[in-house]
């Protein structure tokens, strides 16, 4: 059955170029319903913002986006939807992928289907190693977790306990922080891995208090789990007792800040993007993306990965003249440089991963009473240290 499915992809890839010469379809897989629907909504806002700014045509070709919903991480469903998009819908590009397992599951069909994949969020370093047709426009957990170790040490914190969700990006975050922290003389006194479904964090908070650590490094996927963790951090007295919290920016994404409120004030994170980033490119992007998403408070980081993902896809379409040629499409964007809403970025010609600035941010309160991530330091031109650790 697997051989038949792959053969169908190969046969269809030959016919698709002729059948869809003037329409180039982009298949986007992400969570558009369920507990992570806001992340899918941000994918769509970023895509809509890009197309509002640049139109829906590349040369003589019209770009059409086809969406498929995977509410929670489901590798089997993601692979089935990707096959359906390539075989039945005739998409020439696959994109999106909020969850790492979903992106991993789709990589085996890329070569046979002659289709590139543009990862707009999924953050495990090794995704780009699974196929030469994968390009990433988001970030990796290694990329955003490494600088925060330096920040903790600069704050005088020498002993830290690590707490992460037990899945690919969580393990990456744990390893990234530990490598950078211990190499610089710090000590990770304990490393806790929590099941993804964890919703009672009180026992974890007690272990943190009992560990004797001066600080806690935390990584959880953005959404309901981060809200629960932050509430427990405050309610169990860790914040008031001076145990400092350090994390990559998933923990304080903008769409969660209204719910986190005072609990998040002063929390330090390192990340590739903040909605508050001060640049002409970002102000223009935020204006369009907020129109697209409807509720301005819901705009968050997946939107910029999607926006830049479409920028890369448009370049691929231009380079191939709208024809279906995954190898040529990917080759065209290796080494590509541009100024993104997040700052200067480029696609590494070897890894096909995005090189970008990582920003130290502190949750602050604006004059109008809203909360935002205030950028206070820049780590320039950060690649992905996780690829060297593979």
Swiss-Prot record:
Keywords: Amino-acid transport, Signal, Transport. The keyword Lyase does not apply. CDD domains: PBP1_RPA0985_benzoate-like. InterPro entries: BCAA_transport, Leu-bd, Leu_Ile_Val-bd, Peripla_BP_I. Residues 1-21 form the signal peptide. GO terms for biological process: amino acid transport. The keyword RNA-binding does not apply. Coiled coil: none annotated. Pfam families: Peripla_BP_6. Component of an amino-acid transport system. Belongs to the leucine-binding protein family. This is Leu/Ile/Val-binding protein homolog 6. It comes from Brucella melitensis biotype 1 (strain ATCC 23456 / CCUG 17765 / NCTC 10094 / 16M).
């Amino acid at each position: 059955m697997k051989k038949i499915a792959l053969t169908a992809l190969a046969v269809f890839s030959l016919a698709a170029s002729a059948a869809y010469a003037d329409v180039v379809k982009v298949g986007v897989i992400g969570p558009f319903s369920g507990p992570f629907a806001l992340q899918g909504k941000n994918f769509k806002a970023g895509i809509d913002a890009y197309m509002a700014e640049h139109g829906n045509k590349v040369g003589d070709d019209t770009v059409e986006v086809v969406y498929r919903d995977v509410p929670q991480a489901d590798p089997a469903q993601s692979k089935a939807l990707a096959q359906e998009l390539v075989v039945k819908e005739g998409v020439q590009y696959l994109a999106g992928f909020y969850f790492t397992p979903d992106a991993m599951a789709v990589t085996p069909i890329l070569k046979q289907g002659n289709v590139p994949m543009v990862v707009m969020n999924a953050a495990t370093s090794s995704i780009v190693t699974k196929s030469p047709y994968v390009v990433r426009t988001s970030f990796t957990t290694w990329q955003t977790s490494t600088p925060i170790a330096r920040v903790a040490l600069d704050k005088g914190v020498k002993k830290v306990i690590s707490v992460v969700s037990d899945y690919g990006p969580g393990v990456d975050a744990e390893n990234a922080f530990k490598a950078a922290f211990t190499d610089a003389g710090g000590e990770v006194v304990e490393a806790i891995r929590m099941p993804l479904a964890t919703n009672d964090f009180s026992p974890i908070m007690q272990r943190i208090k009992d560990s004797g650590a001066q600080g806690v490094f935390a990584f959880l996927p953005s959404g309901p789990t981060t809200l629960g963790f932050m509430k427990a951090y405050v309610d169990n007295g860790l914040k008031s007792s001076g145990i400092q919290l350090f994390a990559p920016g998933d923990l304080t994404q903008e769409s969660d800040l209204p719910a986190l409120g005072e609990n998040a004030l002063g929390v330090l994170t390192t990340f590739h993007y903040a909605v508050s980033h001060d640049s002409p490119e970002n102000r223009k992007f935020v204006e369009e993306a907020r129109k697209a998403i409807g509720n301005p408070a819901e705009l968050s980081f997946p939107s910029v990965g999607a926006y830049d993902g479409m920028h890369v896809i448009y370049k691929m379409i231009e380079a191939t003249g709208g024809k279906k040629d995954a190898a040529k499409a990917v080759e065209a964007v290796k080494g590509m440089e541009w100024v993104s809403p997040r700052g200067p970025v480029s696609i590494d010609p070897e890894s096909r991963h995005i090189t970008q600035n990582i920003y130290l941010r502190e949750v602050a309160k604006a004059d109008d009473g809203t909360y935002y991530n205030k950028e206070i330091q820049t780590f320039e031109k950060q690649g992905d240290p996780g690829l060297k650790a593979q």
